Curated annotation (Swiss-Prot):
Residues 1-22 form the signal peptide. Gene3D superfamilies: Immunoglobulins (2.60.40.10). This is Large cysteine-rich periplasmic protein OmcB. Its main location: periplasm. One of its GO terms (cellular component) is periplasmic space. Residues 62-79 have a biased composition (Basic and acidic residues).
């Protein structure tokens, strides 16, 4: 066991010296000296053992055959392992450098060789991961002559052999064998290095989107009756279609509820096999042929179109609504709804639906069903040429522009017939500006101060504009200072505030004037308020007792 440990330590020491030599830290002479000292020291330790163990070791050593020897002997010990009959070098031993990240490299050399006879150096590189541009460099022994190599290469001027492997996959091995011939006795140091670039591979799946569009619609329709088209879009390709957009111009003679002339639908991305359906509804305004064209486009692809032609027939039902263009808030307004059948067919199950805007209250609608802001009349039949008229009385609680929408739906041999109409009324509010004047201290002593506070409030439902305030005081009171939402000016016993541009509904502002009592008496303060709503200025008087 001691013998095995000794030889393992010796091999490790010699290998370390070889590594230092390959890295350039040691010169040739120094490396040879260190190697010789290591081997001599190992022999000296062996001789210090007991004579019995020494004799037994020598006896075992003389009887040991080269083939059965398992431990690695020092490089200079030619008797450690005998060569084969046709070779002049010993058994190969391996030195491994493990680079867990990229490439693992091992180098195998004989335990000993004979001067003048070639011996091999075997280098094996194993890929730890996929690498490219793998470069293996072999430093030739200094006192040896290059014979050949497999793969073949030519030594450089500084005695190096270089091989390049374009790609070495994970788990793949590449073996190199170099034959050199030692020129003199001693230790032949050799070293191999490897340099590799890790390779990262990525895959991009390429496909081709193919957007197809089809459209469905009626062959015939009635004037002023809804015409519905279904646009079907499907991606029949193998890749995602990006930024899919469908454009549908409103055909000539049609109207859309949005008021737009081109309808645009942004579908975003569509996966392969994905299907989308868009429904568009138009109201025909004139008879004749109308063609609806839908065009689909997507990023990097060609535009595709689909069209349907519809023949618009005579109208079946008509509706109109009339009412005031404007009115004051809380004042009732009457709308008149007229429904007629100008066609040749009997209309059945006629439904007249009047929908009012939020904020509008229905006061009266004879013969109708009222539900919140919706009024509905029903008629079993409406003969050709017949007309009906309905009235609805409403009132708005707040100012604003409100639209009254009427839709008539009916059935006929021409199919479902619908007509719609609307009327818009602007409901105006009324401003109601009021003023209140109080003094904070009453009575006051001569030389003391009192404050007049003037509160101006708009109690109405509309804003008031250009609100102006002026205050006049008797000789017993002298204005000292003022405050308010606008600037003011003191002239003698009069204070004038600049006009307030607007006073909103239910809004209150406050003005104040600080006055000094200069003489005893029953003083008076008059506030005069004017605005665009107040055609005649409003005045309010407050008295203050001074003693």
């Amino acid at each position: 066991m001691n013998k095995l440990i000794r030889r393992a330590v010796t091999i490790f020491a010699v290998t370390s010296v070889a590594s230092l030599f390959a890295s350039g830290v040691l010169e040739t002479s120094m490396a040879e000296s260190l190697s010789t000292n290591v081997i001599s020291l190992a022999d000296t330790k062996a001789k210090d053992n007991t004579s019995h163990k020494s004799k037994k070791a020598r006896k075992n050593h003389s009887k040991e055959t080269p083939v059965d020897r398992k431990e690695v002997a020092p490089v200079h010990e030619s008797k450690a392992t005998g060569p084969k009959q046709d070779s002049c070098f010993g058994r190969m031993y391996t030195v491994k450098v493990n680079d867990d990240r990229n490439v693992e490299i091992t180098q195998a050399v004989p335990e000993y060789a004979t001067v003048g006879s070639p011996y091999p150096i075997e280098i094996t590189a194993t890929g730890k991961r996929d690498c490219v541009d793998v470069i293996i460099t072999q430093q030739l022994p200094c006192e040896a002559e290059f014979v050949r190599s497999d793969p073949a290469t030519t030594p450089t001027a500084d005695g190096k052999l270089v091989w390049k492997i374009d790609r070495l996959g994970q788990g793949e091995k590449s073996k190199i064998t170099v034959w050199v011939k030692p020129l003199k006795e001693g230790c032949c140091f050799t070293a191999a290095t490897v340099c590799a670039c890790p390779e990262i591979r990525s895959v991009t799946k390429c496909g081709q989107p193919a957007i197809c569009v089809k459209q469905e619609g009626p062959e015939n329709a009635c004037l002023r009756c809804p015409v519905v088209y279904k646009i079907n879009i499907v991606n029949q390709g193998t890749a995602t279609a990006r930024n899919v957009v469908v454009e549908n111009p409103v055909p000539d003679g049609y109207a859309h509820s949005s008021g737009q002339r081109v309808l645009t639908f942004t579908l975003g991305d569509m996966q392969p096999g994905e299907h989308r359906t868009i429904t568009v509804e138009f109201c025909p305004l004139k008879r004749g042929r109308a063609t609806n064209i839908a065009t689909v486009s997507y990023c990097g692809g060609h535009k595709n179109t689909a069209s349907v032609t519809t023949v618009i027939n005579e109208p079946c039902v008509q509706v109109s609504i009339a009412g005031a263009d404007w009115s004051y808030v809380c004042k009732p307004v009457e709308y008149v709804i007229s429904v007629s059948n100008p066609g040749d067919l009997v209309l059945r199950d006629v439904v007249v639906e009047d929908t009012l805007s939020p904020g509008v209250t229905v006061l009266e609608a004879a013969g109708a069903q009222i539900s919140c802001n919706k009024v509905v009349w029903t008629v079993k039949e409406l003969n050709p040429g017949e007309s009906l008229q309905y009235k609805v009385l409403v009132r708005a609680q707040t100012p604003g522009q409100f639209t009254n929408n009427v839709v008539v739906k009916s059935c006929s041999d021409c199919g479902t017939c619908t007509s719609c109409a609307e009327a818009t009324t602007y409901w105006k509010g009324v401003a109601a500006t009021h003023m209140c004047v109080v003094d904070t201290c009453d009575p006051v002593c001569v030389g003391e101060n009192t404050v007049y506070r003037i509160c101006v409030t708009n109690r109405g439902s509309a804003e008031d504009t250009n609100v102006s305030l002026m205050l006049k005081f008797s000789k017993e009171l002298q204005p000292v200072s003022f405050s308010g939402p606008t600037k003011g000016t003191i002239t003698g016993n009069t204070v004038v505030f600049d006009s307030l541009p607007r006073l909103g509904s239910k809004e209150t502002v406050e003005f104040s004037v600080t006055l000094k009592a200069v003489s005893a008496g029953d003083a008076r303060g008059e506030a005069i308020l004017s605005s665009d709503t107040l055609t005649v200025p409003v005045s309010d008087t407050e008295n203050t007792h001074i003693y």
